[in-house]
Amino acid sequence: MSHGGTRVSEAAIYTLEQEANPILRTPDWAKDAIWYQIMVDRFRNGTTQNDPPRARDWRSEWYASSPWEGRDGQSFYEWFVFDRLYGGDIRGLEEKLDHLSDLGVNALYLNPMFQAEGHHKYNTTNYIHVDENFGAGGDYAAAEAAEDLMDPDTWTWTRSDRIFLEFLKTAKARGFRVIIDGVFNHVGTQHPAFRDVIEKGPDSTYADWFDVRSWDPFKYEGWAGYQSLPVFKKSEDGLASTEARRHIFDITRRWMDPDGDGDPSDGIDGWRLDVPNEIALPFWIDWCEHVRSINPDAYISGEIWDRADQWLDGRSFDAVMNYEFAKVAFEWIGHRKDKITPSEADRRLAELRIAYPAEVTYVLQNLIDSHDTDRAVSKLVNPDRTYDSGNREQQDPTYDGSKPDADAYRRLRLLALLQMTYVGAPMIYYGDEVGMWGSDDPNNRKPMLWQDLEPYEESEENFVDTDLLEFYKQVIALRREHPSLRTGDFTSVGTDDEQDVWMFARSDDEERILVALNAGDSEASIDLPDGAWTPLFPTAVGEAESGRITIDRLSGRVWLEDR
C-alpha cells in the first residue's frame, strides 16, 4: 500500500462467515439501521401544556442558575443541575422527525419513557405508563390509583400512553424503527411496590422484590450506592422474586403488542437493556425468548461495556452497545501521546469481529459516545484518557469543557466516516451532528440545539454547526446508498503506521468499495489497489483514479471499484 521503509500489513480478508451458531439470526432490518439516541427531556419541547414544574427555558445559558436554583444552598454540581427539567416530550419528537429523516437515520433508541422523576427516567416510578410530562401531563396519579400492579387486566391506557403509541405509528409510517430503554435492574423510590415495602415492611406483598439488608432500621441496596435506585433482589437464576419477574414479562408484552391481538406492528421494535450484566444470564435467556415469542423480528441490545461473548452466542441479546469499537476508534483517531497505530486498531477490531458471530457483528450498535460518556468532540480535546474515565469537570479540574477547536471537529468527522463505513450499525448521540459538546454527566445532556430557536444565550458558542450537519448527512447518505457498507464483507487492505493510514474494503456481489482513513497530522500518499476507482467521498465527481493518490490530514476518502 505504501513505499520505502514504512510497514505495510498483509491484506486480511474477513468474510463474516457464520460458524459459531448456524441457527443464530438477527433482524435483517437491524443490519440496515443507522441509529440515533434520544434523551427525550433534552431533545425538543413540542408543547408547554405538559411541562413539569419549573421547566427551564430551552435557550437559557447552561451554567447560569434559574431564580429557584441554589436557594437552599446547593451549588451547580451539588446538585441542582441534576434536577433540571426542560420539557422535552413526545410531541417534540414527532415535530422533529423531519430533522431525523433529512439527516438520514432510520432507527431511534429512546432513553427511558416510563413514568419517573427527574430528566433521565432511569428511576422508574411505573413501567405500566409513559411519563406524563412526555405525553398529556397530569394523567398518571388517577390511573395508578385504579390499577392492581400485578393484574394486567386492570391496567388502563392513559392519554400519555396513547400519545406514545400514536408516535410509534407515525414514526413507523415514515420508515423509522423505535426501541426503548428497559431498566429492569432497579426502580425509583416512588415505584408502587417499593412504596408498599416502605409502608408495610416485611409484611408487604412485595417484600421479596427488593434487596433489603435490614428491616429495623430499614436499609436496602441501591444501584451503585444511590438510595434513590432500589435494586431488585437477585438469585443465581436472575430475579429472586417470581412475581417481580412476572411483572417485567407482563409489561414487556404490553409495550410490544399494545392491543394484545398477536400483531406486534403497533408496538415498539425492541429494547436497549440497562446494566443487564447485573442480572444473571438465565433470566435474560428466558426474557429474550419471551420477547421473540411476541415479535420474532424484535431487536435486543444490551449495555455491556466490555467484551460480550457470553451475551452474544444466540441465547440472549442480538447486540450490545459497542463500546469496544469506540475505545479503539478514540485510541487511534483521538489520542496523542498514547495513540495506537492503525495496525493495532486493525488487529483489535479484527479480534472483535472474530469473537462474535457474523449475524451479531452486522447489528452491533457502533457508537462513539452516549448519555453515559463525555461528548465525542469533547473527548477529542481531552485526549489520552481511558475511555469514560476522568471526564467529569466537577471531579477533574484538568478536563477542558470549553467549546472544542476546529481540529477536534475535524477528528470528529473522521470518526463519523469510520462509523458509517465500518461493519456494524452506526449510532449517533443526539446533537453530535450539530456540534454539541460537553464533559460527562451532566454536561453531555444539554438541550438540543435547533436553528429555529436561535439565538441562544451565549450565542457566540451555542448554534447549529451547519457545515458539520451537512457532513453527517453526506456520510449517512453514503452508507444508505451502498448496501455493501451495511451488509457487505469486510477486508482489511492494509495499514501504514508511518503515515497513520488504514485502508479497508466493503464488498458484496454487486460492488466493492474502498475506504482510506488518514488519522495523521500530515497529508498522506498511498497507492490504490490495482484497478480503477471512482471517487464517492468527499466528492462523487471526477474520473476514475488509480496508482498513487493523496489524502489530507485527519480525513478520509472513499471509492467505488469500476467493474
Where are these regions (language model features)?
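Conserved, mostly hydrophobic/aromatic
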Residues: 38, 100, 110, 127, ...
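Extended acidic/polar, glycine-enriched regions
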Residues: 1-19
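Substrate-binding/active-site clefts of carbohydrate-active enzymes
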Residues: 30-33, 40-106, 113-265, 287, ...
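Hydrophobic faces of well-ordered beta-strands that scaffold small-molecule active sites
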Residues: 34-36, 108-110, 178-180, 271, ...
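C-terminal beta-strand-rich structural cap/linker in extracellular carbohydrate-active enzymes
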Residues: 34, 545-563
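Loop/helix patches that line or flank the sugar-binding groove of alpha-linked glycan CAZymes
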Residues: 30, 46-80, 85, 306, ...
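Active-site-proximal helices and loops of the catalytic beta/alpha 8
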Residues: 168-176, 186, 195-201, 251, ...
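Solvent-exposed beta-hairpin/edge-strand motifs
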Residues: 530-540
